Amino acid sequence: WITNPFEPHITNGRLYGRGASDMKTAISSFMVATEIFLEENKFAFDGTISFLITILRRRGEAEFGTKSLIKWIKSKKKKIDYCLVGEPTNPNRLGEMIKIGRRGSINFLLEVLGEQGHVAYPEKADNPIDNLEKIFKELHKPFDSGSKRFQPTKLIITSIDSSNFTSNIIPGKVEIRFNVRFNDKFNSQQVINLIKKRIKSVTTKYKLSSKVSGESFFNYSNILTDSLVRSIKTVTRCNPILSTTGGTSDARFISEICPVVEFGLVGKTMHKVNEMVEIRSINKLTKIYHQFIKNIFLKNEFNK
């Protein structure tokens, strides 16, 4: 780092620090935008603007943070009409992309079982590695060709491990870890069932465990999306792409209670050394959020 990552530092028109692009600055921009809006409309505003800000969001299996907050909102029967998440959705320039949905995600651990033995006597052992080629062929069969809103479901193998560090022992098992990113043609249980079916077509000697990170979701609210698109066009003159690509986000939890879209800064440096954002982008984002709030709450603005 050229600066202390935990102390914001401005140099050459850029703000450096951990979270500068993902996504602390977006929170600050929305707060300033809200302050400006309330000053302008303090006698005409009868809605509610809330900030959902959490900590420990990435600890464990996302049990804390947003997920817990959504449980609390449900328990209190609080009604939320719309939500905007300030994720850094833009690949290269501000105004380029809005996320209006996300693919679902499941992590799998497959243990293919065999019988350990000496390599000199393969007839007395059962090498689980021998089945891998057939298993991989089954797992990599296409799930679908995509949908109207999403790209095709995709399986990616991330590791293969027999825990065998010698060259003269046939392993008793081999572990394969893989992830499936699935579209709106499936729910998580359907994906799990299909994976089991494909493995069983090759072998019954296996164990399979899975962890669902989130279901796929899509925002069907025209008002929410249109309000944000108009705001971006007004400030940047860009016509944003409406996208469902990329990884999971906390919007997957929020989608359980209300329509949600995601828009923030450029994400080129997020999670990297010297994470930064241009000051002019922060100012533009604040203007976009300000216009978005007006579009949502002031009918005369939305109907322009």
Segment roles from a protein language model:
Residues 13-14, 18, 50, 54, 81-83, 154, 243-245, ...:
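Structural motif
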Residues 4, 11, 26, 104-106, ...:
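Activation loop
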Residues 1-18, 38-45:
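Acidic/His- and Gly-rich active-site-bordering loop/insert found
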Residues 14-29, 118:
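Glycine/serine-rich anion-binding loops at beta->alpha junctions
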Residues 88-93, 100, 106-304:
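Metal-dependent amide/peptide-bond hydrolase catalytic core
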